[in-house]
Structure formats: structure tokens, C-alpha cells
């Protein structure tokens, strides 16, 4: 079993990470070659999300229990919720001789970039084209105004980390962004 190629796709909320990763996995070549990482979180499930497909939703007590047992490759608290990447994803990718695509927050991406156990890691920072567009996307997701403002402030901080990522992709439209990400992922995986 060789070390899997791991891709971390990070960026501010509203940049389109989840949508792009979902569309990437509708491509046969991607499905055959990669495992999709599903994050564990304590945040409230949005109406369109499915437990086990988009995230594994747990309460804070369960999350902290898993963290104490070293269940996660990395875990972070973002705003008022915890997020964690299960170690088992990396092991399953390794065992299945597949790559791994993770859609995680910026702090988590930086933690994995420094992790010596992950030998083949490519980081991709996904950004919205403008602050106004980011705000519009968050509003469309029906987030509360107070939450949107917190996320916009967080996005400003997260954008400062884009220079540490291997790639910066601006999500102006889904079709072009998907093509660009697919080219990066398939190109780097060779």
C-alpha cells in the first residue's frame, strides 16, 4: 500500500467548496480514483444536507469524546462549531489504493500541510471573486445576518492564508472552476 495523494480544498464559507467537490465526484474518473472525505461537525445541519454524505453531524459531547480518542487527523473550532477530519479516511484511501479529496477549513488545511505523516499533499484555496459575491452566496444559503457578518470577518482572515496554498482558484462560475480543479487534481495525481 502506497501513501495516498491527498488534496485539501479550503476557502471561506460561501466560496463554493462543497458544491465544487460534489460536482467533482459526479465525474467517473474522479469517483474511480479518489475517496471523498466527509467531515465530522457539531454545526447545525442545513435543510439540503444529508448526514453521512455532506457531513457526519454529532453533538459537542460526542465530538470532544472522539477528539480525546485521537479519532481525527485534524480538528478545529470555527466560529461556534467543531469540525474534524477522521483518520480512517486516510487509512481507507491507502488501503484502497485511492487518492483522498478533503473539503476542510483553512486552519485544518494548514495543520495537514505541516503533518509529516501525509507524504503527498496538494492544497487548493478556493475563493469567491469578490466580498460582495461571497456575501450574496452566504445570504442565498439562508444564513442569519449575524452569522453572515461573522463569516465575512472570518473570510478576511482566511484569505491571508491563501499564499501558503499550492493553488489559488477563484470561483467565478462553477463550470470553469470545476474544469480547473479537475485538471489540477488529475494532473497532480499522476
Spans of features found by a protein language model:
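Hydrophobic anchor at the beta1->P-loop junction of P-loop NTPases
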Residues: 9
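The conserved Walker
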Residues: 12-13
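Walker A/P-loop
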Residues: 18
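The feature captures the helix immediately C-terminal to the Walker
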Residues: 21-22
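Post-Walker A helix-loop "phosphate-sensing" segment adjacent to the P-loop in P-loop NTPases
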Residues: 26-36
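ATP-dependent small-molecule kinase phosphotransfer cores
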Residues: 39-100, 106-108
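Conserved phosphate-donor/acceptor-positioning beta-strand/loop module used by diverse small-molecule
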Residues: 101-106, 118-141
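Small-molecule kinase domains that catalyze NTP-dependent phosphoryl transfer to phosphate-bearing small molecules
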Residues: 143-184
Amino acid at each position: 500500500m502506497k501513501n495516498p495523494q491527498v488534496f485539501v480544498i479550503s476557502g471561506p464559507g460561501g466560496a463554493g467548496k462543497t458544491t465544487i467537490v460534489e460536482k467533482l465526484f459526479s465525474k467517473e474518473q474522479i469517483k474511480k480514483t479518489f475517496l471523498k472525505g466527509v467531515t465530522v461537525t457539531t454545526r447545525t445541519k442545513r435543510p439540503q444536507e444529508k448526514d453521512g454524505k455532506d457531513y457526519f453531524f454529532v453533538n459537542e459531547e460526542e465530538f470532544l469524546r472522539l477528539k480525546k480518542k485521537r479519532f481525527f487527523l485534524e480538528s478545529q473550532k470555527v466560529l461556534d462549531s467543531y469540525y474534524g477530519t477522521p483518520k480512517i479516511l486516510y487509512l481507507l484511501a491507502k488501503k484502497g489504493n485511492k487518492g483522498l479529496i478533503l473539503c476542510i477549513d483553512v486552519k485544518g488545511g494548514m495543520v495537514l500541510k505541516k503533518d509529516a505523516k501525509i507524504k503527498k499533499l496538494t492544497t487548493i484555496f478556493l475563493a469567491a471573486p469578490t466580498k460582495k459575491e461571497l456575501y450574496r452566496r452566504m445570504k442565498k444559503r439562508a444564513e442569519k445576518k449575524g452569522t453572515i457578518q461573522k463569516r465575512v470577518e472570518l473570510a478576511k482572515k482566511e484569505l491571508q492564508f491563501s499564499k501558503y496554498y499550492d493553488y489559488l482558484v477563484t470561483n467565478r462560475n462553477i463550470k470553469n472552476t470545476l474544469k480547473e480543479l479537475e485538471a489540477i487534481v488529475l494532473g497532480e495525481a499522476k
